Structure formats: structure tokens, C-alpha cells
From Swiss-Prot:
It catalyses: (6R)-10-formyltetrahydrofolate + 5-amino-1-(5-phospho-beta-D-ribosyl)imidazole-4-carboxamide = 5-formamido-1-(5-phospho-D-ribosyl)imidazole-4-carboxamide + (6S)-5,6,7,8-tetrahydrofolate; IMP + H2O = 5-formamido-1-(5-phospho-D-ribosyl)imidazole-4-carboxamide. The gene is purH. It comes from Synechocystis sp. (strain ATCC 27184 / PCC 6803 / Kazusa). This is Bifunctional purine biosynthesis protein PurH. Coiled coil: none annotated. The keyword Transferase applies.
Amino acid sequence: MARLALLSVSDKSGIVELAQRLVNEFQFDLISSGGTAKTLKEAGVPVTKVSDYTGAPEILGGRVKTLHPRIHGGILARRDLPSDQADLEANDIRPLDLVVVNLYPFEQTIAKPGVTVAEAVEQIDIGGPAMIRATAKNFAHTTVLTNPNQYEAYLQALQEQGEIPLALRQQFAGEAFALTNAYDQAIANYFSGLSGDSANQFGLSGTLRQPLRYGENPHQSAGWYQTGREATGWAKAEKLQGKELSYNNLVDLEAARRIINEFDVREPAAVILKHTNPCGVALAPTLVEAYQKAFNADATSAFGGIVALNQPLDGPTAAAMVKTFLECIVAPGCDAEAQEILAKKNNLRVLILPDLATGPSQTIKAIAGGFLVQSADDEREDPSTWQVVTEKQPSGEELAELAFAWKVCKHVKSNAITITKNKTTLGVGAGQMNRVGSVEIALKQAGTEAQGACLASDAFFPFDDSVRTAAAAGITTIIQPGGSMRDQDSIQAANELGLVMIFTGVRHFLH
């Protein structure tokens, strides 16, 4: 008797080629449902519709197709158990040798802007996971394929050995259970997130995309995992050139992506970053000017840095970049002239990520015995809600500068201070255990350029010492969240010293 395979896939990549080889080279009979059967018939592949095989029509608009004893009996039957074989014969059920199934694109659906719950629900697969789990459970007797990347390995084993080795069937089963686990977890997370509250159950699942040489340090092992079936985010980035990405590269690139995403793509912006902290950020009329301003903000720290741009990389900007050693560059595009220039630095990693705006909606940190989950700090603030708390009012130009400094400060490790002028960072005080210490570091970097500059603080000033220190160096405008028991002391000092100070009402700790 010919072997029997069931094919029912949402992702139809390679399915026609697989079906043709199963029929022509290995004499399989095929059964299929819905769109897959239609695709195979149109390609001239002989196939029997599931409804014809089971004798039961597809019902409820296609919600019930494969949930039938002739399908699941054929999947779950143990070939070495006489009672199972007797049941198959009594019910005219053929054993299934191969089940090829992938699932409705639930994650891709919920990622679309404005998707409704009803639309999401229709992409929750029922029959697919049931068949996948059943086949994976019975891997001792049958094979499940859940990814087009598996097709060639299956066909090669069949060609070379005439059957699928147990170890390979077991491997496919493990991958199948990982898929259904991730799928169910995505659905659970979606429904938990609808309420906006912390879920009672939260899971994270990923597929190893790339083993990394090591983690933050050479003695630490690491891997890069991709969430979802389809590549998104950095997994979708195109690497034009350069060495393999490291763990630290990816961490820094994500930090750079978050900062560059703060700025409107209509105004050229450049970010240079080291160890997840920006050392230079600038806006300018042209991209090359923005990069040069960001570089000059702290040329020493820029050596070996990560650069992010909000506009496609052009020749003049690339020419400026190759004058120093950089680890990585990411931009939404890159023209031919820039590629030719950058190619001279063959170790320089250059990535194209058109969608720099899309990032994770949550952040997760491991702790002993569990992990912490929080929503991402990515909400856009409305400056009209900010409060000027000093007697002196900011000009329109000063308000724009304060907004720029505030956007950068949000992405500096706490305690965070940024000093800016002309939409360019002059000094960055990061990660100090006391706020005035971060102020002093930022002022030291800014030097005499602090005269007439703007200062941003990611959290309130517990005392007025930071205000007085800033004013003594020439700072004229300050932006901070407010919220200290001693806010009035800082306001009084600002008024006394003739400063402008704004309270945003939003804190941006970053640990």
C-alpha cells in the first residue's frame, strides 16, 4: 500500500515542490484541506480533499475540517500494537506516515495596527495544533513537519535510507511541541494584555536564530533567539557587510534603535552609542552634519561605537564614518555610493533595518526564582502637558532644545543627566549613584560650551545642589520630572539664579 501524507499549511512556501516529490519519487498518496488542496490541484498534483477522505464536509465556515477519527486515528495509531491495527481495519482508516502542518498567522495578525479581537480570534488555529501534537506524540511511528526548512532534510533521509530515522522523527517532534507551545503562549499573552493588567501566567518562547560566540564576556555562553515564526525586528535586518554580530553588538544596536526612534525621520538625526549609553546625539539639516556633530560631541568615546541614523546612509556620511573605527552602523537604507565607501572597512558591520520604529512592547529581566515584566518606556510625551515652574518662561527655541535634551536623557542609564545646545549633546552623565555626581560629569564634558546650554535630568532633584551647580557652569534651562519633597527648594534656587525650569511629570529611570 502506498504511504499516506496529510498536507495542510498556512505558509505554502515549498509545499508544491514537496508534494510533487512525495508523489513522483516516493509514491505517496496525498490528502489535504482548504487552500492547500486548491494550491496543489492548481499545480497538477494529485490530491484528495480531507472532506472526501473522511466523508464529513467542512463545516462552520471551515472551522472544522480535520477534527475527525479517520484523521486522528491514522495519526495516533501504533503500528506495533495489534489492537490499534484492528481498530484501523474495522473503521477503514489508513495510517498516516507524514503530517505537514503549519499554523494560522496569529502573531502576524495581532501585530497589525488596529486589529480587532474578532480578527485575532479568527486566526487562532484549532485543527492544526491538534494534528501537530498528535503526530509529535506518535513520533515512534510517524513524522510531523511544521516548517518549510525541514522539507529538504525529510526528503534527503527518505531518499538515502528509504525511511525516516527515529532520531530525526524525534527531532521534528521536539520542534513541533516547541511551535505549539510558542503559539499557545502568544495567544495567552495577547488575551492577558487586553486587560492591561499583569497576567497570572506569562511565558516567553523563541527559536534559536544564531549561536553567538559568547555573551557579554568570553566566559559566558549566549544565543540569539527569534520570537514568532516570521523574522521581525533585528532578525529581519539585512547585514550588508562585516563580521558576525556579537551579543554586545545586538544589545547596543537595540539601545541605539530606541534612541533614534525618538526623532522625526524628516529631520536628519545621528546617534553614537557605547555600552548602551549615548555619547553623541545630534540633529542637523543634512545627515553628514548630524553625524559629524554627534561624533564631535565626544570623539574619544565614539571610537569603537555603534551608530544609528534615521535616514538612508549616503556617500558623504559614509565618507565621514570611515575616518574612525566603528563597530556597527544601522540605518533604514544605504545608497550605492555609501556601500562602495564602506566596503573598504570590511570588518565594519553595516545593517539595514527599514522599520526602526517597531520594537518590543515589554521588557523582561531575570531574577532569582523568576523574572520581571514591564511595559516598554516608549510612550510619546505631549510637551503641552509640561509645567513651567519658574518665573522665567522659555522661548520657543529653548522649549525645542529642552524637548531634544529630554528625549536623549530618557535613554541614559540612571542617574542620568544630559547637557545639550543646538540639538547636539555636549555632556552626558550616566549611571552615577548620586545625581549631582552625574551633573558634574556632564558639565565637565561640556566644558565652556555649557554656557547657555540646556540640562535634562531623568528623575527629580532631591536637593537644590544640582540646580546651583548647573547654574554656576552657565546652564540656563532645566527639564526634569519633578516630584521631590524638596521641589520648592529647586524652584526657589532656579528663580534666584534666573533659570527656566520645566517639570514633565514623567520619570525615566533606566537600570
